[in-house]
Amino acid sequence: MKPLRLAFAGTPDFAAASLQAVLDNGHQVVAVLTQPDRAAGRGKKLQQSPVKQLAHSQGITVLQPENLKGEAIHQQLRDLNLDALVVVAYGLIIPQAVLDMPRLGCLNVHGSLLPRWRGAAPIQRAITAGDTETGNTIMQMEAGLDTGPMLLSESLPIGDSETGGELHDRLAAQGARLLVTVLQDLEKYLANATPQPDEGITYAHKLSKAEARLDFRLPTGALYNRIRAFNPFPVSWVPLNGQPMRIWRASESPQPAQANDEPGYILSVDDQGIHVATGDGSLILEELQLPGKRRMAVSDLLRGNPTLFSVGEPLGDAIINESGDHSGNA
């Protein structure tokens, strides 16, 4: 198949992997759409998205509309005379008028095995749910949220200790590879597209920092999965003196729960880490980040602060009362 005339819409690192793969395989990317530069970091300086940085390095025209609703951006896209628009983690709604513009429509790389985990955060939701596998789906876009016909999918096992960041990187590479495969014979894949099944639909709602606050009344496995899933964003935490203490890494303890163990209280502190009671056992916290400090292994942290955590005391302000309110603020 001859090289396609494409535009690419994407924003984060996950999307940049796909853009690089498309460029490496000789397709003509005539424009890149990415979200406007956003203020980020402590200095709140404007940051270019990874996709914009890659596009600039390749001399590709970059478009950064606040949305895709206006006639001006519609005319710009019509003038590109596209064979297809590739959309990967763009972050803006694609209206029907834009979906209808390219000759062969719009394609999307989605980091799950659809219809499971439609939506914004499929990678993290798969881990929090305790899924043992996930994958990527290349689909033809339509107006619904990740509802379009599937062109190609491939599964990927989730490691027992894999973090959201680690799984993200493996899925980004897999998605890029599958995208290139589809683009090599796009019309054949479109002709053989498969509707998504009506069974097994779940939604991967957007992540928030508030939900990353740990409730130690949950089972150990659920807490462990949350800590893995939310590394490196939004990062699990509990309040310590009114500020978030981040929990980067933990492991499940084999010790069963004791009748008098109160969730959120420290059971022991040793070379493994801080053993904290949960709803059905205990969790070993192995890497923490105190407010305003860098992340550290608990063993290193305790060398400089041996009395920071005391057995029989709650972990920071981690206790939640029976009404569901937290005893501390963040």
Swiss-Prot record:
GO CC list: cytosol
Stored PROSITE patterns: GART
Alphabetized Pfam families for the sequence: Formyl_trans_C, Formyl_trans_N
Keyword Protein biosynthesis: yes
Catalysed conversion reaction: L-methionyl-tRNA(fMet) + (6R)-10-formyltetrahydrofolate = N-formyl-L-methionyl-tRNA(fMet) + (6S)-5,6,7,8-tetrahydrofolate + H(+)
Keyword ATP-binding included in the entry's annotation: no
Enzyme Commission no: 2.1.2.9
Record keywords, A-Z: Protein biosynthesis, Transferase
Ligand binding ((6S)-5,6,7,8-tetrahydrofolate): S112, L113, L114, P115
Molecular function per GO: methionyl-tRNA formyltransferase activity
The family this protein is said to belong to: Belongs to the Fmt family.
Protein name, entry field: Methionyl-tRNA formyltransferase
Protein species of origin: Alcanivorax borkumensis (strain ATCC 700651 / DSM 11573 / NCIMB 13689 / SK2)
Taxon lineage: Bacteria, Pseudomonadati, Pseudomonadota, Gammaproteobacteria, Oceanospirillales
